[in-house]
Curated annotation (Swiss-Prot):
It comes from Cuscuta exaltata. The keyword Signal does not apply. The modification Phosphothreonine is found at T2. This is Photosystem II protein D1. GO terms for molecular function: chlorophyll binding; electron transporter, transferring electrons within the cyclic electron transport pathway of photosynthesis activity; iron ion binding; oxidoreductase activity, acting on diphenols and related substances as donors, oxygen as acceptor; oxygen evolving activity. The record marks A344, A345 as: Cleavage. The gene is psbA. Gene3D superfamilies: Photosystem II protein D1-like (1.20.85.10).
Amino acid sequence: MTAILERRESENLWGRFCNWITSTENRLYIGWFGVLMIPTLLTATSVFIIAFIAAPPVDIDGIREPVSGSLLYGNNIISGAIIPTSAAIGLHFYPIWEAASVDEWLYNGGPYELIVLHFLLGVACYMGREWELSFRLGMRPWIAVAYSAPVAAATAVFLIYPIGQGSFSDGMPLGISGTFNFMIVFQAEHNILMHPFHMLGVAGVFGGSLFSAMHGSLVTSSLIRETTENESANEGYRFGQEEETYNIVAAHGYFGRLIFQYASFNNSRSLHFFLAAWPVVGIWFTALGISTMAFNLNGFNFNQSVVDSQGRVINTWADIINRANLGMEVMHERNAHNFPLDLAAIEAPATNG
């Protein structure tokens, strides 16, 4: 009898826990994805803060030349970064217990791998939590679908690209100037500016900014007057009110006359779908582009593609970009190799005598 009562009590405790986890009445929804999201994101955030402040220099290139990234080792907010895991580690799983000591783990950039893997798990669970909350509230699932774009982008630069290049040392550093360095080296090695998927991503981000500004300014300019001149126009809206707060017909008429009739949406639902879909699809393509360039399927190469009747090269903008790429490639990891791959692949000219 005692055993039965204990089992019922434990089942009741588990049931209450399940109800609490999945309750939409909590101030912040947890959900089953949140059970994994909370510890992973807390771990990633805590280690990032500690490492950004105090981590010792990391031998990123695996050539016994440590690079300092933390504030206590001479950096500021702009130059500081979590330095990627050493090329000596490659793609090996490198938790603390795999190193001979904590000093060795820090020297080889163990915190970067710890942060990145926990962060990617955390943001993936955040996306799942968005879907889970939408499901429990009877909403459609498109919030999580939209969030999949930045998740895909983060996964591309922190996981897919290192896998394709064979080492976590090629991942994006976790810092401002480190991100810029990653972008410059990526251009030098993969010619990303000439990749059509990157072009679609630029159109997505810049176009999304333009459409967001256009939509916001049109709505703000066609608000239905509910206030006097001495009050803020924002006071004319009450949360949850049934009537429209702006005149979509006026906005449609204005924009249709500014450009042409069919450039303006006359359906609020299709308009907002477009505003969401445009940047999301663009960022999807960018993430896909990073993932293909990870395996060296690079941007277009139009170098020396125009010649005159005598066979002499007429430089185009592609040749100017190529020269810049070579310059950037020569400068990065300058002590890890003598020549960039593009130059090393060219046969040395024959000499007489």
